[in-house]
Amino acid sequence: MECSHCNQSVLSTDVSFHKGPGAKNDIRIIKTRRRSSNPSSSEERGKTLYNNLINLLGDRWTANIIALAFHGFNRFDDFHKELPVATNILADRLKLLVNEAIFYQQPYQASPLRYNYHLTDKGRDLFPYFVTLMAWGDKWCTTGDGNPILLKHISCGADLHAEVRCDQCGEGLIATEVHFKR
């Protein structure tokens, strides 16, 4: 993924996040609670038909937790304050993300034992996925008030408009010009 302004590669550490004009319309503030559980161990997930990115991130809580980690959130209480999720579901999702090596735990308090949750390299590599989904949402799920989150590329100072490009020719990828191989 590259910045369309300066054409440099962009990592999650190269970007700052700011609330945009559409932030007040974030549907996560609606306190809807549903009970659901995802298998939290590889063995349990191995019993499912598919074990892939969609199974890991297709759950709204897991995807939101990872997105918040890119914003600098790293404690259970901080995730819980931001998301209207039941504590047992949040604990389950954090356990899943640690088991899948998306997060690693670092103790910050001994009694009672509490952890900071940090993105691993594997987790940080999900950044282009989230930026691409944000761009899609900004285009197709607009409320008319503007984007809820604005990204700035720290290196060049421009608003980030990321492009996924071919690693061979450097051109932006167009869905009709990409073929998937099995």
Residue ranges, per PLM feature:
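C-terminal regulatory/oligomerization modules of transcriptional regulators
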Residues: M1-R34, T142-R182
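Short, Lys/Arg-enriched N-terminal segment that forms or immediately precedes the first helix
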Residues: I30-I54
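N-terminal helix-turn-helix DNA-binding core of bacterial DNA-binding proteins
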Residues: T48-I89
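Short, hydrophobic-biased segments on the C-terminal half of alpha helices
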Residues: L94-K95
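Amphipathic, soluble alpha-helical interaction motifs
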Residues: E100, W136-K139
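Beta-hairpin "wing" of winged helix-turn-helix
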Residues: E100-L113
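Basic, amphipathic "hinge/linker" alpha-helix immediately C-terminal to the N-terminal HTH DNA-binding motif
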Residues: S111-F130
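Globin-like tetrapyrrole-binding proteins
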Residues: L133
